[in-house]
Amino acid sequence: MAAIGVHLGCTSACVAVYKDGRADVVANDAGDRVTPAVVAYSEREQVVGLAAKQSRIRNISSTVVKVKQILGRSTADPQAQKYISESKCLVIEKNGKLQYEIDTGEETKLVSPEDVARLIFSKMKETAHSVLGSDANDVVVTVPFDFGEKQKSALGEAAGAAGFNVLRLIHEPSAALLAYGIGQDCPTGKSNVLVFKLGGTSLSLSIMEVNSGMYRVLSTNTSDNIGGVHFTDSLAQYLASEFQRLFKHDVRGSARAMMKLMNSAEVAKHSLSTLGSANCFVDSLYEGQDFDCNVSRARFELLCSPLFNKCIEAVRALLQQSGFTADDINKVVLCGGSSRIPRLQQLIKDLFPAGDLLNSIPPDEVIPIGAAIEAGILVGKESTSGDDSVLIECSARDILVKGVDESGANRFTVLFPSGTPLPARRQHTLQAPGSISSVCLELYESEGKNSVKEETKFAQVVLQDLDKKENGLRDILAVLTMKRDGSLQVTCTDQETGKCEAITVEVAS
């Protein structure tokens, strides 16, 4: 039985299938192995992918991009606030949830981020079915390591709404290691691996320990000010300055003109990963004036030098944070399309002269291939080269319970610190006045910061209809079990009466 792996990134999506003992990326109907994560709306239809991206110049206010940045977030989230301020589509809050207000010309419609993601997942399913047939719907979906529970849930629900049977959510760094079979090549040895993911909008770094085939995240960091789009923008700004030099007009104040330059710069950026120069041609950039400019790889590297330095400094900072030196890293796995840039690869090689730089798999295909391998494992492919023991076995964030101290102030107790090896079980006793008939256990998540905000609450268990006591306290025993797949099972039991309630929260391993 075949299985599917899907990676939905901020700027692109990719699907791989596991069949006959191997995982391969599937090209879409345009022949591209990576699909732009862009959805364009009109009064008659929704268009996903390259056609939507190409039409954005004409329909910018009805074309949704970077939906992953807002998925599962609230207006109180700083990331959502930044997205809303930059979005060319109007984003509003309705009934406590974020919605896109899309003007198609004929009507105005409200569209949820989850529905946008559903359409992209549907495109991935259609692409996978082109080689597997319509019966194959088992999928593993990747998520960033720093995604919160609400974001993970929204991503999984969007995949389910597209008709996928979601077997598991898997963290992107773990999928990258699975793609290269790290841990299987030396199942009894111990090594440290840096996963370097330069995606469309951010740089995500993870240092992972591989020990006897088991993975553990030691340290991770994400920089939202370094991504592929920033490299593209550096080149687009240069093209704008060249146009101004030649034609005495600054087009940087025109959103339409800059979008044309960004599209041309993106194509050139991709070409410069393999060629020494690239031509940037824009038809009718300003008042009917065409623009033609040749850019060398050396020029591009000079323009992007500050960004290269930021990438390397981010790696150095993570090493210092983890207490490692460059010599402690045995392998570096490259992920994300912009990690193809030759100059960046050379800088990484220079930083880790003793480590192996793994880039034999196209960097923008590594993560979905790893997800497909994991899906193959889960559906029981007897010919798989993998083993269930190589899954990431740690919690991504601190999991806390909320209580009240003697002064009445909120008190948070960390039960599963970030990086806790899985599976794991914790017990927590909650004391409540005997005079009340219901008790609520609230679960929160955090990134290890000193305070926990209300929006980080992700689940609760309520014990109701308890017999009241005139005096004293009642003890409620909470047993929390986080399984290998990252799901969290919570059972609360009144110790006096035995009354209990239980929930299961699906999270990513």
Swiss-Prot record:
Listed GO CC annotations: cytoplasm; cytosol; nucleus; plasma membrane; ribosome
UniProt main location, coarse: cytoplasm
UniProt keyword terms in alphabetical order: ATP-binding, Chaperone, Cytoplasm, Nucleotide-binding
GO molecular-function term, one example from the UniProt record: heat shock protein binding
Compartmental location: Cytoplasm, Cytosol
PROSITE patterns: HSP70_3
Its job: Component of the ribosome-associated complex (RAC), a complex involved in folding or maintaining nascent polypeptides in a folding-competent state. In the RAC complex, binds to the nascent polypeptide chain, while DNAJC2 stimulates its ATPase activity.
UniProt family annotation: Belongs to the heat shock protein 70 family.
Subunit structure and binding partners: Component of ribosome-associated complex (RAC), a heterodimer composed of Hsp70/DnaK-type chaperone HSPA14 and Hsp40/DnaJ-type chaperone DNAJC2.
Record-given protein name: Heat shock 70 kDa protein 14
Organism annotation: Rattus norvegicus
Classification of source organism: Eukaryota, Metazoa, Chordata, Craniata, Vertebrata
Gene that produces this protein: Hspa14
